[in-house]
Amino acid sequence: MTEIKKYSALNDLAEKGGTVIFGGKEDKDIPLCELRQAFELGSNYYNRSFENLSIENAAELYLSSVAPLAPETVLLHIGENDLDLFANNPDKFLELYRELVCKIKSESRDCYIAIVSLKNYDNDSLIAKLNERLKYLADSERCEFVDVSQKKVWNPRSTKDAISFICSLGFVRHLKSHEPVYDLARTLFCYA
């Protein structure tokens, strides 16, 4: 896979720590540098998204492309390519997702994990069920769940001001990252 080779070469240059987006085809084109500049996001941000990421190959790809970065935070946005699997065998999908979360925790005990829902702007019942199960999984595994399923009125300027204000007061989560994860994920996954 050329993506793995590309990410391996980038990982050799990257600083360890920071926040990693681990998602699918939709996430590969997130304009991370531009959003980082526009919202004055601190820390290091890396996008390790794969065109054909599935929950069935996620653990292997995580180990080869994300784990070497020793991330402080991982934003998991997985499921886009797994709708058929979820429709036919939701328990297997959730079992594989839980195994991925456990693998991340075993690789880095202090890594903060956020599970990001799938977008569901058309109110698809299958995606709604998948997101519901992802929320349950996040709760049971003590991960943060970020719901980006519905279009929301979003004012980028007020989000930027709110993030800046909260951080200036010192209200940050217990790790080193300086942005609240929910607002960070909304910024990264809902910019368009």
Where would I find each of the regions flagged by the language model?
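Charged, glycine-enriched surface loops/patches
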Residues: 91-116, 133-143
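Substrate-gating cap/lid alpha-helix
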Residues: 120-151, 159
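N-terminal secretory targeting modules
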Residues: 1-20, 27, 32-33, 37-41, ...
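Short, amphipathic alpha-helical "lid/cap" segments that border enzyme active or binding sites
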Residues: 59, 90, 94, 98, ...
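Active-site segments of SGNH/GDSL-like serine hydrolases
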Residues: 77-81, 105-129
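Conserved SGNH/GDSL esterase-like catalytic core that processes O-acyl groups on lipids
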Residues: 2-95, 125
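Structural signal for conserved beta-strand scaffold positions within catalytic alpha/beta enzyme cores
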Residues: 46-49, 115, 147
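A short acidic, often aromatic-flanked loop/helix-cap motif at beta-alpha or helix-coil junctions
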Residues: 53-56, 151-156
